[in-house]
Amino acid sequence: QQDYGTGWFDF
């Protein structure tokens, strides 16, 4: 799931 708030990915 990509975290579009930070640009990183939530694992």
Curated annotation (Swiss-Prot):
Keywords: Amidation, Amphibian defense peptide, Hypotensive agent, Pyrrolidone carboxylic acid, Secreted, Sulfation. GO terms for cellular component: extracellular region. The modification Pyrrolidone carboxylic acid is found at Q1. The modification Phenylalanine amide is found at F11. Isoform 3.2Y4 differs from isoform 3.2 in not being sulfated. Expressed by the skin dorsal glands. One of its GO terms (biological process) is regulation of blood pressure. Its main location: secreted. It is found in: Secreted. The modification Sulfotyrosine is found at Y4. Belongs to the gastrin/cholecystokinin family. Hypotensive neuropeptide. This is Caerulein-3.2/3.2Y4. It comes from Ranoidea citropa.
